[in-house]
Design a protein with these regions (language model features):
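Long, low-complexity N-terminal extensions
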Residues: 1-244
C-alpha cells in the first residue's frame, strides 16, 4: 500500500525526489535490478584476488570470450558487475580511462581505491541529476599492488564494491547480484584469511553449488585470478572446467 501511495504522489518518478519516509524510490528500484543480475563472488586471498562470476546458461551461438564477465581495467585491476550490462560497460570504460590517465600523468599505476572512488563519484552524481536515472549496476573491483603495501597503504590485495548510491567499501570477500545475501551469509561462515587462489575459487564454487542446487553447472562460470608474480601483476582468466 505504501508503494502505491508513493507512486500516486509521483515520488517514484524522479531520482532527485525524496519520499516522505526518507527513501529515494528510483534508487531502490535500481537496487532491485541488480538482484536480477547474475551473481559474482570476490575473495581476497594470500597475495591475490579471485573473482568467480555466473554467466547463467551457456549459449552455443555466443562466442565464449565475448561473454566473459571478468573485465581488465589495468594490468593490476579487474572488475565484474551485476545489473544492466550496458550501464556496466560505460563505467568499465570510464575506469580504464581513469587508470590510463593516471599512468600518463604520473608515470605510475593508479591505486585501486582511486579508480573505484572516481567510478563511485559518477554513480553518486546520477542520484542527483534531474532527467537521468541512476546506474542500474553494482561493481566489484579487485586490485593488487606489485612489490608491497605502499600504494594501497593497507595490504597487497584489495577488493572493493560500489553500490547504486555511489558508496564504496573494502571487503575481505563479497557477493553481488542474484541471491547476494544468501551468498554473503555463507561467506561469513566459511571465509578464512590467507587462502590460496585455488582455495578461493574452490570456496566460491562450493557456495554457488549450494545456493543453485540442481541448476549448478561448472560451464556457467567465469573466473579471474589477479596475483603478483616476479614483482609484476598477472591476470589469469578461466572458464568452465578450467576452474576445477
Amino acid at each position: 500500500m505504501e508503494d502505491i501511495q508513493h507512486q500516486q504522489m509521483g515520488y517514484d518518478r524522479a531520482a532527485t525526489m525524496f519520499a516522505p519516509d526518507g527513501h529515494i524510490l528510483q534508487v531502490e528500484y535500481a537496487e532491485k535490478t541488480i538482484r536480477l543480475g547474475s551473481a559474482s563472488i570476490g575473495i581476497v586471498c594470500k597475495n591475490s584476488v579471485v573473482i568467480v562470476s555466473d554467466r547463467r546458461r551457456k549459449d552455443i551461438l555466443v562466442i565464449e570470450d565475448s561473454a566473459n564477465k571478468i573485465n581488465e581495467i589495468d594490468e593490476h585491476i579487474i572488475a565484474v558487475s551485476a545489473g544492466i550490462s550496458s550501464d556496466a560497460r560505460v563505467l568499465i570504460e570510464k575506469a580504464r580511462v581513469v587508470a590510463q590517465q593516471h599512468r600518463v600523468t604520473y608515470d605510475s599505476a593508479a591505486s585501486t581505491e582511486s579508480v573505484v572512488r572516481d567510478i563511485a563519484d559518477v554513480k553518486q552524481q546520477f542520484t542527483q541529476y534531474g532527467g537521468a536515472r541512476p546506474f542500474g549496476v553494482s561493481m566489484m573491483f579487485g586490485g593488487i599492488t606489485p612489490g608491497g603495501k605502499a600504494q594501497e597503504g593497507h595490504g597487497d590485495a584489495v577488493l572493493y564494491t560500489t553500490d547504486i548510491t555511489g558508496n564504496y567499501l573494502r571487503y575481505n570477500a563479497n557477493a553481488i547480484g542474484e541471491n547476494d545475501e544468501v551468498i554473503k551469509k555463507l561467506l561469513r561462515e566459511r571465509y578464512k584469511k590467507d587462502l590460496t587462489s585455488g582455495e578461493g575459487i574452490k570456496l566460491a564454487l562450493e557456495i554457488f553449488k549450494e545456493v543453485q542446487g540442481d541448476d549448478f553447472s561448472i560451464e556457467r562460470f567465469d573466473g579471474g585470478i589477479l596475483s603478483e608474480i616476479g614483482g609484476k601483476p598477472k591476470i589469469v582468466k578461466k572458464s568452465g572446467k578450467e576452474l576445477e
